[in-house]
């Protein structure tokens, strides 16, 4: 019996080691693919337009600094200002989106009211509606209230993000026991104090993930800024990249 148990234990350890090896191998392969994308980004940045049209190459060329200088000194765009604008918009959007989505998820999770399920269903239904569907009305509203060439229409709508709300609610259901919230209420803690001092620290992993995702999504947003921002000093990086694509490629 002892020999049989020892044999089974060795087989289990061998299977565990094999499983870990396969998992690590897959992760290394996926990481290499991601790093290869960044590598090709640098390689293509070091090539001229004629080189890019000639075909695929793995080795960097010698035009990286010239391309960077041409893009940085291009009179039609202001890259430092564009980076600052994008950081401001994306940073504000990420912080506000994550906080208020977590607050909304807490309200749905912690309170029982008649229309709780209806409210959750409505928020989920909004998630399937493409933003392009309501873009015309939204842009007309911005023009009516003179909100063009302003970052408010880019930041405020992003606060109501059903995807982030859904993620935060599901995370709360797995890590936030209501007994902790009830104990805080018994001790006299207000709802906002409970949320900010007790609930949010328990959501740090989810908050970090959603901050990153929201920041990247806002940073890559081209659709609304292209419709609402006309002044050159207010344009974000995606708009400037589009301008570079439409510019004279012989310089790059």
Regions found by a protein language model. Name each.
Residues 1-15:
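Short, Lys/Arg-rich, polar N-terminal cytosolic tail immediately upstream
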Residues 11-15, 19-252:
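A structural signal for multi-pass alpha-helical bundles of membrane permease subunits
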């Amino acid at each position: 019996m002892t020999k049989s148990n020892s044999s089974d234990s060795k087989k289990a350890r061998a299977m565990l080691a094999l499983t870990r090896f396969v998992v690590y191998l897959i992760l290394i392969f996926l990481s290499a693919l991601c790093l290869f994308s960044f590598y090709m980004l640098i390689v293509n940045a070091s090539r001229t337009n004629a080189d890019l049209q000639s075909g695929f190459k793995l080795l960097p060329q010698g035009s990286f600094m010239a391309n960077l200088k041409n893009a940085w000194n291009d009179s039609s765009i202001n890259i430092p200002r564009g980076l600052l604008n994008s950081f401001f918009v994306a940073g504000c959007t990420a912080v506000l989106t994550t906080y208020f989505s977590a607050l909304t998820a807490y309200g749905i999770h912690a309170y029982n009211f008649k229309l709780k399920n209806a409210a959750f269903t409505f928020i989920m239904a909004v998630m399937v509606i493409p933003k392009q569907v309501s873009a015309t009305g939204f842009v007309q509203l911005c023009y009516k209230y003179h909100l063009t060439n302003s970052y408010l229409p880019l930041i405020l709508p992003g606060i109501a993000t059903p995807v982030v709300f859904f993620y935060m609610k599901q995370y709360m259901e797995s890590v936030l026991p209501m007994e902790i919230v009830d104990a805080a209420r018994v001790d006299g803690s207000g709802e906002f104090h409970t949320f900010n001092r007790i609930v949010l620290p328990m959501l740090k992993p989810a908050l970090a993930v959603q901050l990153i995702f929201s920041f990247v999504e806002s940073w890559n947003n081209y659709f609304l800024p292209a419709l609402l921002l006309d002044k050159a000093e207010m344009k974000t990086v995606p708009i400037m990249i589009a301008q570079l694509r439409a510019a004279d490629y012989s310089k790059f």
